[in-house]
Each structure stands twice: as C-alpha cells, then as structure tokens.
Design a protein with these regions (language model features):
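Charge-dense, helix-prone N-terminal extensions
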Residues: 2-152
Length: 152
C-alpha cells in the first residue's frame, strides 16, 4: 500500500480494447494494479445491474473517504487507508455483489453475514435491493478507523 501507481496491463487472455473475461459468477477478470483507474476498469466490466452497484459503492466510499487508497488484486477491488491496510473489498457473485469488511465483526451493528474467519463480515447486495447509503457510510467510516489487513 505504498500508494505507487502501477501500469495496467491487459490480463492473460485480454488484449488492448477487448472486454475483460467474466469469471465464475460474472466477476470480471482484471489485471492487478493500484489506484482509481484500475478500480474503475473493474467497475466498468461488472455485468448489468452489478455495475450500478459497483459505481454506487465506489461513490459512497470515495465521498466518505476522499483520501482512500484503491487497488485491484485477485479480480477484486480493495479500499484502504494509507499506512493502515485494507478495510473493504467487493466482488461479483452470481446473484449478488459481496461486500467484505475485513474487521466487520468490530462494526456496530455488524454486517449481517458471518464468515469462516472470525473478524470478517459480509454484506450482500442483490439486484432488487435498495442500497442503504446511510448504513454503508457508517460501516465505511467505522472500518476505516480500525487496523486494516496487509493483504499484499
């Protein structure tokens, strides 16, 4: 999380100008990289209604935390605070977008879906859901103040 920008290169099976491959569950295959640009590429490649969810999530996070750090690894956008690690990521599942709070068990109220990892909690957004921006903003603020994960 050094804040350095890395050059985005097309994925293994992607050449310049081609749409990213969609993996299992419709998750876009995006080359790893740091910064807003690669996250926007991921969001642009999210299929259908999931792209709207991705844009909404990114907007809420960026509006709430203007200095947030962004990266894509393992076909997942990550958000974190400089020097504190990563606090949130999201990716496409067949029927929903899974938002991961790495220290979600410490949030109040905790996001509703438990993980096998005791600290991790999930929030699933389905196509018909209306996004509760107030609750998400509160979770994002709380999560950004906790020690994040050093994932990469």
């Amino acid at each position: 999380m050094a804040g350095k920008k890395s050059e985005k290169l097309p994925g293994k099976n992607q050449s310049q100008g081609e749409k990213p491959k969609l993996l299992s569950g419709g998750n876009p295959q995006i080359a790893k990289g740091d910064g807003d640009s690669v996250v926007q590429d991921y969001i642009a490649a999210m299929p259908g209604w999931k792209g709207d969810v991705g844009r909404c999530l990114d907007s809420i996070i960026t509006r709430t935390l203007p200095k947030v750090q962004k990266a894509v690894r393992w076909n997942t956008p990550f958000y974190g605070m400089e020097g504190q690690g990563w606090f949130l990521g999201f990716h496409c599942i067949t029927k929903y977008v899974k938002v991961t709070f790495f220290r979600g068990a410490s949030l109040r109220p905790a996001p509703p879906v438990k993980s096998k990892q005791i600290e991790v909690r999930y929030f699933h957004i389905f196509e018909e859901d209306k996004i509760d921006e107030e609750q998400l903003t509160d979770w994002i603020l709380q999560a950004s103040k906790l020690p994040g994960e050093s994932l990469f």
